[in-house]
Every structure is written in structure tokens, then in C-alpha cells.
Design a protein with these regions (language model features):
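A generic short-segment signal for beta-strand/edge and adjacent turn/coil regions
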Residues: 23, 53-60, 121-131
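Generic detector of contiguous secondary-structure segments
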Residues: 13, 50-55, 146-149
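Conserved beta-strand hairpin/beta-sheet module of binuclear metal-dependent hydrolase folds
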Residues: 1-50
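Flexible, acidic/histidine-containing loops and adjacent segments that form or flank the divalent-metal
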Residues: 1, 69-161
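Active-site environment of divalent metal-dependent phosphoester hydrolases
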Residues: 10-12, 31-33, 60-66, 94-97
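Structural recognition of the beta-strand scaffold that forms the well-ordered cores
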Residues: 17, 23-27, 53-57, 85-90, ...
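Active-site metal-binding motif and surrounding structural segment of the metallo-beta-lactamase
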Residues: 35-89
Length: 161
């Protein structure tokens, strides 16, 4: 197993690459992270016949989701960059939210492409994924993940703590 830390400035983006062809993407950094660092690496993995078993979005701050949005826009329904089996989000999908309660979150870093992230964006991201054939939290029947949840895979398991 190899953990690749993708250059994301103050953001987060990691790819776990197993020798047996399995891969996991954790967070997407900023949109510039995707364009400059993540996309070329995902295309490389795809050229080697690898797939993303899981794309995990830990939370909806700008420095985690902006690159993820760009990735899914590029990948599209036909999964042109790399095949994705399942998306795991830690989000609002199972929580009722009034539009008046939505508070935008943004990062203000010099030289970084800034987009705002909010619960509205989260809801839109999740809906877009589902509408384009990317299952969300399938291992939990679409419900939010909680500490203690475990995904058992062929050769490994993931425990959320």
C-alpha cells in the first residue's frame, strides 16, 4: 500500500494505492489542486487499470471539496478520468436543514481559486453524484456515517473513528 499526499497548499488530498488495483481518494483539496496535481495522478492510475473503490469527502470546507467538485465535473457520468465505485460523504444528507440556516463557509488564501462551500452546496454535490451514477454511502444505505462504522472490502477494511 502506498499513500500519496497530493500537494494541496493548506488543503487536504490523499490517494491510497494498493498493489492489487484498489485505490481510495480522500478529499480533493482546492480546485487548483485537482487541475495541477490530482487529475494527472488519477489519469496515471487509470492507465494502469486501477479504479477508485471509494472517494471519501471528510467534510465540506473549501480546501476539501473544491477539487472534488472539479474532479466529478471532469469525470462525468461516463467516468472519463477514472472509474469510481462509491462516494462516501460525512454530511447533511440525513439531517433536515432549513434554507435560512445555511451559513456559507469559505477560505481566503492568496493565490488560490476560491469557491464557497455550504450545506446547500453539499446537498447539490450529493444530488449531482447520485443523478450521475455515483452511489453515496451505499454501505450505509445512503445514511450518514458515524464513528465505529466499518466497511469490509476484499483485502482491507476501513473503520471510521
Amino acid at each position: 500500500m502506498r499513500v500519496r499526499i497530493i500537494k494541496a497548499r493548506s488543503g487536504d488530498c490523499f490517494v491510497i494505492d494498493f498493489e492489487n488495483g484498489h485505490c481510495i481518494l480522500i478529499d480533493g483539496g482546492y480546485s487548483n489542486t485537482y487541475k495541477a496535481e490530482l487529475k494527472p495522478y488519477l489519469e496515471y492510475l487509470n492507465s494502469k487499470g486501477k479504479v477508485l473503490d471509494y472517494v471519501i469527502l471528510t467534510h465540506y470546507d473549501e480546501d476539501h471539496i473544491a477539487g472534488m467538485i472539479k474532479f466529478f465535473e471532469d469525470n462525468g457520468e461516463k467516468q472519463r478520468v477514472i472509474p469510481v465505485k462509491e462516494v462516501i460523504v460525512n454530511g447533511f444528507s440525513s439531517v433536515a436543514c432549513d434554507d435560512n440556516d445555511v451559513k456559507p463557509v469559505s477560505a481566503h488564501k492568496r493565490g488560490i481559486d476560491i469557491q464557497k462551500a455550504s450545506s446547500k452546496q453539499e446537498y447539490s454535490f450529493e444530488n449531482w453524484c447520485m443523478d450521475n451514477g455515483y452511489p453515496i454511502n451505499r454501505f450505509k444505505s445512503g445514511k450518514s456515517i458515524i464513528a465505529g462504522d466499518i466497511i469490509d472490502c476484499e483485502d482491507y477494511s476501513i473503520k471510521f473513528a
